[in-house]
Amino acid sequence: MKKIESTQELEKAVKDDWSVFMFSADWCPDCRFVEPFLPELEANFPEFTYYYVDRDKFIDTCAEWEIYGIPSFVVFNEGKEVNRFVSKDRKTKEEIEQFLTDSLAKA
């Protein structure tokens, strides 16, 4: 997973093919919960490029994109939002897998 460091990087990544943005924060226990199985998800869904977005560093983007809970996931394809899994609830591996499968089905 690539870490987004600037607004310019984020804007460029949004325009790529099949980008998954994970909004997270170091202090978030539910975000830490998903970390152990993220590499497996990345391997099982190679169609996507995965990006980590620090909620605290990109607080304005979170407001603009209506990211009000973390961890949250947003999928873009060629500059268009395809799907989102945004809530304050803890996400399971199975829920994220279903989200990624559903995102690809919207192609």
UniProtKB/Swiss-Prot annotation:
PROSITE patterns noted in UniProt: THIOREDOXIN_2
Keyword field contains Transport: no
Domain called Thioredoxin: residue spans: 1-105
Cystine bridges: 28-31
Xref: CDD domains: TRX_family
A Pfam cross-reference name: Thioredoxin
Induction of the gene: Up-regulated in response to depletion of tryptophan, phenylalanine, tyrosine, or availability of charged tRNATrp.
Keywords: Disulfide bond, Redox-active center
InterPro entries in alphabetical order: Thioredoxin-like_sf, Thioredoxin_domain, Thioredoxin_H-type-like
Gene3D superfamilies the UniProt entry points to: Glutaredoxin
Protein name: Thioredoxin-like protein YtpP
PANTHER family in UniProt: THIOREDOXIN, THIOREDOXIN-1-RELATED
Phylogenetic classification of the source organism: Bacteria, Bacillati, Bacillota, Bacilli, Bacillales
